[in-house]
């Protein structure tokens, strides 16, 4: 990772504030997995605009039975037309998981492409990838939580990234990846949450 980019990240991270994690009413130290998305946009031949797009923090471990777990998640088939045209991307599918672990509903919340084309072409490719991901997601099975604060919920929402990649190799840590974000759509049951 270039030194200038590391300095940019450090400068931003130094400004972050976190609420403490409490155990027995006292603040305790925790370790989490962290993911950071840095987006760079080329302005001219040697200048870029850089911003922190997203950060996520996930526990290193979760007590068994305290959250929704996957049971059967066969990946979707790569749409043939997309593969022939060199189209790749990530579909963020939001899934409504019922109490029996079946999928009650699924929506392509956002489709990000790894290629640039006309607005119309990108909209069409987002539809193709989104449809393939949602069709397969409706067949998936999950294991509902049986303990903890989520156990008695009527349903659970799960967000799953579905990658359509032509190459089986993912970018390594610190490598740039093309990213053309698509519009974010709400899902019908969001108002109930």
Predicted features along the sequence, with ranges:
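Charge-biased low-complexity segments
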Residues: 1-193
């Amino acid at each position: 990772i270039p030194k200038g980019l590391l300095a940019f990240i450090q400068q931003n991270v130094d400004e972050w504030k976190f609420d403490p994690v409490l155990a027995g009413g006292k603040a305790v130290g925790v370790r989490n997995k962290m993911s950071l998305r840095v987006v760079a946009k080329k302005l001219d031949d040697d200048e870029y605009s850089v911003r922190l797009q997203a950060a996520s923090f996930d526990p290193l471990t979760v007590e068994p039975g305290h959250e929704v777990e996957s049971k059967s998640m066969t990946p979707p088939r790569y749409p043939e037309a997309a593969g022939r045209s060199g189209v790749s991307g990530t579909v963020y599918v939001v899934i409504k998981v019922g109490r029996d672990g079946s999928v009650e509903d699924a929506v392509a919340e956002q489709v990000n492409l790894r290629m640039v084309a006309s607005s119309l072409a990108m909209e069409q490719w987002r539809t193709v990838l989104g449809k393939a991901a949602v069709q397969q997601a409706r067949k998936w099975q999950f294991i509902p939580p049986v303990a903890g604060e989520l156990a008695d919920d009527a349903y659970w929402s799960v967000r799953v990234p579905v990658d359509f990649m032509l190459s089986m190799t993912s970018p390594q840590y610190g490598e740039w990846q093309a990213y053309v974000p698509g519009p974010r759509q709400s899902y019908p049951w969001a108002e109930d949450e």
